[in-house]
Curated annotation (Swiss-Prot):
Cellular localization per UniProt: Cell membrane
UniProt-annotated stretches for the region Connecting peptide: 299-308
Job description of the protein: Involved in the presentation of foreign antigens to the immune system.
Annotated S-S bridges: C125-C188, C227-C283
Descriptive protein name: Patr class I histocompatibility antigen, alpha chain G
Species for this entry: Pan troglodytes
Single Gene Ontology BP annotation: antigen processing and presentation of endogenous peptide antigen via MHC class I via ER pathway, TAP-independent
Cytoplasmic-facing ranges: 333-338
Amino acid sequence: MVVMAPRTLFLLLSGALTLTETWAGSHSMRYFSAAVSRPGRGEPRFIAMGYVDDTQFVWFDSDSACPRMEPRAPWVEQEGPEYWEEETRNTKAHAQTDRINLQTLRGYYNQSEASSHTLQWMIGCDLGSDGRLLRGYEQYAYDGKDYLALNEDLRSWTAADTAAQISKRKCEAANAAEQRRAYLEGTCVEWLHRYLENGKEMLQRADPPKTHVTHHPVFDYEATLRCWALGFYPAEIILTWQRDGEDQTQDVELVETRPAGDGTFQKWAAVVVPSGEEQRYTCHVQHEGLPEPLMLRWKQSSLPTIPIMGIVAGLVVLAAVVTGAAVAAVLWRKKSSD
């Protein structure tokens, strides 16, 4: 069996756990984790990661030489040794719980011990511009499919199938929703406020995108216009194409926002246009760091306007690095297991 690399785990997480988009001016804290069984190769691997907005700040990997919760942002490094000891202790407890849960779920689904399986988890809270809780959420996924989710009222659960109904009944018997609600309405909000204050220079900044439009001939009769937005933060951005002032939806390709590896993000939107009609098309960019929305056209020149290979290669590689994997047990101790 091939052992999964962290990048693969991130892709699994992004595919199964749906992230709620934060509103403009809002902030979020999210923890993700993934436990992957590997029969014949020891205990399941457990990876965990925490994010404030679009910035990773903690990381844990059970396969490291000395597994500990580690800082990934300068503003969290100032926390004392007691903080990191508790983070590590709680994360290891969460990892052990998920290893047991993997065995339990394999039994629920009557699956072979020889096959590998994945349990994913996400919890988080969003704050509005007034600093109050907008929403809280917790989700579980098994083998890349929805399993169990805390409802928006933070008082009840939604089970995806018959097996998940068993876990739902266990959560209800243990008053798990009440525990989660206390964390999401209290501890999560308090720590998010603390992190936003300690890391305000990084977390509350708004870096505007660097934008340009490139031209790529496809056939003699049509071409692709690609609108680029590079180096922006936070990640939320809107790119649209218009033809003669009307929004275009057909023949438009829009990629997901991707991390650039330096704390900023990248995105592009492309549209296929008839050759000779390029100037009828405009790209419109909206981002928090811009004083007003931008409107761009392709500027024809004697040189080809293809993006440099470094940018293209970087985007391809970075497409696999998505917000993914960490642990809410960092801030609350998981008291029930499937």
